[in-house]
Amino acid sequence: PDREVSIAEYGAKSGDLQIETGRHNAEAINRAICEVSEQGGGTVRVPAGIWAVAPLRLLSGVNLHLDSQAMLKFIKSKEDYPLRITSYEGQDCIRTVSPVTAKNAENIAITGEGIIDGSGDKWRPIKKFKMTEKQWDALFTISPYVLETKETAIWMPTESILKGNHHNIQGNTEEALAAAAPYYDFYRPVMISLRHCKNVLLQGVTFMNSPAWNIHPYFCENLTVEHIQVRNPYYAQNGDGIDVESCTNVHIHHSVFETGDDAICMKSGKNAIARKIQGPCSNVYIHDCLVNEGHGGFVIGSEMSRGVKDILVENCTFVGTDVGVRMKSALGRGGVVENITL
């Protein structure tokens, strides 16, 4: 549809990165998205400027378009990131809401030349062995909290993340959610959560600084990812680029990834619970992509219990990765990997 609105028309304000401004802007942008969707679809435009924002919900028929020199900068506060039961690393678990969520939506897009910044540096722990001594010392000007492990010391951005590591409350009940609430930022979200969506386009935008994974399409159909950039620092814990889980008809091309973990990853659930649901990751075409940094360039698994099949990867360049092509498995996962062409 031709309908186009600017978030400024709905009262959004740029240049102020305070939490209250982020909440105000999120209300304005979500209202614009809702109205455009209800009127049959169209474009919600983010003009040039830095816009503080709280979590957003993308609805059917809406293209969230970021102009050149536009940035959505997500604030972080407990009130804006309630806990929920969702899927992460192949199984149901507790996480906070994501900065951007779409669920059961059709004909949606995030396009343009701007930047989505998830403020992941306020969420992510950092392992000491990944830092220089000077970098490590600088972290303590932000937070004094450190978790000592057999492997390495791990810096924590907040006390609640440190306590969350000690308690590690898990489960899929209301009681578990309530018990975990004081440690909300231990349960880091993926930045872009696309669940059970159809006809999805990600084009041109830079996705960066995610709390955990950058982009997580889950049981989506007809997904196109083109000309995007995904950027996380090399030390970003769980800083995956895109994790395509149990999706079908996927086209990823002419995109650049710099990540702290796997870059372009195919997944399909974890262990016996996942195998009860049909949904392999299938019919995926990946080409003309550049991975400058990451654990793996093109990766399958290790959550692949529903299977991964019919994948073609060609004309991609993996530079500075730990492993260019990474097939990960784990005892008991099950699942069949077949018809993979590189």
Residue ranges and their predicted role:
Residues 1-342:
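Extracellular/periplasmic carbohydrate-active domains that bind, remodel
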